[in-house]
Every structure is written in C-alpha cells, then in structure tokens.
C-alpha cells in the first residue's frame, strides 16, 4: 500500500493572450503550489482492473485518475491491478487543480510501481493530454506558464500564506470561455514585470465570474476588505495573500463560505517520491 499527498495550486494571475486555430486559448500565468492536499492510496489487488474509491458518481471513463492509469498501462513492465482510494480535501470545480493533481500523482506513482521507466518529460507529455494543468504537478515546481499552460519556466517564489475562499457554486469553464466579453488579447508580459508590480496582474476570468456567479462576487467583496482578492483559474475559489495587518482567525471565522489558510510550497512533496523496494 502506498499513501501519498496530491497538492493544489493557485494561479497568481491569469491572462489570455490569444486564440489558436484549433480553438485553444494562449495564456500566461504563474502556478503556485500550496499545502492543501488530497490523499491518494494505491493498493495492489489480484484482479486485473483499476478500482477507484472516493469520487462519487464520476464515470470511470471520464475519471482523470483512471485515464492516467490507462495511458501508462501499455508501458508497464510489472502491471498489477489496483484499488485507488482518494480522500478529497481540494474542492472540485474550484480552480485549484485538484483533478489535474490527482492525474499527475497517478502517473508519478504508477510509473514506478509498474516499472514503466518513463522520464519526467515523457510523463508530462502524457499528462498534457489529460489536462493543461497536469504537467505542473508532474514536475512539482512553481512555474511561469505559457501556451495553453504546458510551456513551463520554473521560478523561485517567496514563501507566503494565503486565505482561500470556496464560494458555494460550481463554475462552468465552458460558459466563461463562451462569453463574448471575455478578454482574449491581453498584452504578453514577463515574470520580471510581475515581480515589479504583482498587484497589476489580475485574472481575465474574474469580471465574468463575478457577474455570472453572485457567490463569487460576495467572496471577492469580503476578501477585498482585508487585502487584494484574486480569482484562481476559472474559479470558483478566490484568494488573498496574508499580510501582517490581517487578523487571520477573524477573517476565517466570519467568511461567507468555506475558508482555508494555506501555505505556499517551494516544491511538491512528490518531487522526490520513490516506491520502497
């Protein structure tokens, strides 16, 4: 039995800079890993199948964990059936990358457990087929991202704490992308520019999320009283960096929805994962 953490991420900003002919959007963002974890347990079983426990009514063929395992199966030198249990702490549909992280964790663990012998780069190439956020969790380092999110430049970020709010709504990414008022032509920028004035960098999805989802608007207004609230991903989660002036316990206590205090990570706990021999 192997039990490992599967971390979440924040988008410290998110700009859409263009659109490809295939419909995919070009973007720029910073991925910040945080210490909010799902926990995944991998247990070999005698049956030649993948069993998944803990994700409710998600159909197996649509499950990113199952799909990750199926991608690796042809490369397995020592295949075995598995019971995979997931303990969810990262809210779903929140912009925190929980599903992508779970897929990446599955690729990392099974690459060793099944003796696939694939490199980190090969795992990332498989991962991007499952979702644009998956490679960041494969590499397990904070990064400046471009393209559809798959072109990564690893960066060193200061240690910080964040208050994260999860409004009681599920945001449709497709709905936000379909809005004609979505800004799709942000001017490309650089990490150096971000470092000089991070408060100038927002999220192109934020105005739409606030307009279409009153719960997001309420959470943003609440956090804006204490700091600079931002949307992560396409939402629904919003966050603000903790400052010395904040009474964190009081902010968490009176939040209008589920609230978390999280810490930034320099790297994923899976960065140096090894299956015990």
Swiss-Prot record:
Entry coiled-coil feature ranges: none
EC code(s) of this entry: 2.7.1.148
Reactions it catalyzes: 4-CDP-2-C-methyl-D-erythritol + ATP = 4-CDP-2-C-methyl-D-erythritol 2-phosphate + ADP + H(+)
Pathway(s) per entry: Isoprenoid biosynthesis; isopentenyl diphosphate biosynthesis via DXP pathway; isopentenyl diphosphate from 1-deoxy-D-xylulose 5-phosphate: step 3/6
Active site: 9, 133
Gene Ontology biological-process annotations: isopentenyl diphosphate biosynthetic process, methylerythritol 4-phosphate pathway; terpenoid biosynthetic process
Keyword vocabulary terms for this entry: ATP-binding, Isoprene biosynthesis, Kinase, Nucleotide-binding, Transferase
Residues annotated for ATP binding in this entry: 91-101
Stored SUPFAM superfamilies: GHMP Kinase, C-terminal domain, Ribosomal protein S5 domain 2-like
Transmembrane segments: none
EC main group: transferase
Segment forming the signal sequence: none
GO molecular function, one term: ATP binding
Superkingdom as given in the UniProt entry: Bacteria
Protein task: Catalyzes the phosphorylation of the position 2 hydroxy group of 4-diphosphocytidyl-2C-methyl-D-erythritol.
Family listed: Belongs to the GHMP kinase family. IspE subfamily.
Record protein name field: 4-diphosphocytidyl-2-C-methyl-D-erythritol kinase
Organism classification: Bacteria, Pseudomonadati, Pseudomonadota, Gammaproteobacteria, Moraxellales
């Amino acid at each position: 039995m192997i039990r490992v953490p599967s971390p979440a991420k924040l988008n410290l900003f998110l700009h859409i800079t263009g659109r490809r002919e295939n419909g995919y959007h070009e973007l720029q963002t910073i991925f910040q890993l945080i210490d909010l974890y799902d926990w995944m347990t991998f247990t070999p079983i005698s049956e030649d199948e993948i069993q998944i426990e803990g994700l409710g009514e998600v159909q197996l063929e649509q499950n990113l964990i199952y799909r990750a395992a199926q991608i690796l199966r042809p490369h397995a030198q020592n295949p075995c059936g598995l019971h995979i249990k997931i303990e969810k702490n990262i809210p779903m549909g929140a912009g925190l990358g929980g599903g992508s992280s779970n897929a990446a964790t599955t690729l990392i663990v099974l690459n060793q457990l099944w003796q696939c012998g694939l490199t980190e780069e090969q795992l990332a190439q498989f991962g991007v087929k499952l979702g644009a956020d998956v490679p960041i969790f494969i590499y397990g380092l904070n990064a400046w991202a471009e393209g559809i999110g798959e072109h990564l430049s690893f960066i060193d970020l200061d240690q910080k704490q964040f208050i994260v709010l999860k409004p009681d709504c599920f945001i449709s990414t497709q709905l936000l992308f379909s809005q004609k008022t979505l800004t799709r032509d942000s001017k490309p920028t650089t990490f150096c520019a971000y470092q000089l004035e991070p408060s100038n960098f927002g999220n192109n999805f934020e105005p739409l999320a606030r307009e279409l989802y009153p719960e997001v608007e309420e959470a943003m207004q609440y956090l804006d009283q204490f700091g600079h609230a931002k949307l992560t991903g396409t939402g629904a989660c919003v966050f603000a960096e903790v400052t010395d002036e904040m009474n964190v316990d009081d902010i968490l206590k009176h939040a209008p929805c589920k609230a978390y205090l999280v810490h930034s990570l320099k790297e994923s706990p899976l960065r140096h994962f090894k299956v015990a021999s």
